[in-house]
Amino acid sequence: MATLKDVKRLKALCEKYDLEGREILDKFTNTELQSVYNGIGPESFPDWLRGLVNTLHPTLEPVAFIHDAEWALSDGTETSFAASNARFKRNGYKAAKAEFGWWRPRRYLVMNDARRYGNYCQLFGWSAWRAPYDERRKANGQV
């Protein structure tokens, strides 16, 4: 789980990088964002693996922060699912460009990782996208 310090740092980076969709973070308190954000990778990753991925890809952490908030408020539709994953890629490109000059190879590595991770989410993330939506429907007696 993220600390309050992590949440504040990630929110500031979302602003610094001018990431798309960051306004969704305003729908949560900082305490709620602590539990919503699980880092880069699926919830099924063990903590040590997610920690490793986050350490190796710090530029993509604010991108995943927005992505996790979107998934927590999932509407369960394929259209929104695809839009969230496409936004992950675009935001990853923005973060890479903001953090690394065009002459730095790291910029292109981060951009490629953003593309790959967005594609992984699109290919393998449907059940994780649906889970919060289905839980809300069940809690409201709609299922």
Question: Residue ranges of each PLM-predicted region?
Answer:
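Extended terminal accessory/targeting regions
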Residues: 1-143
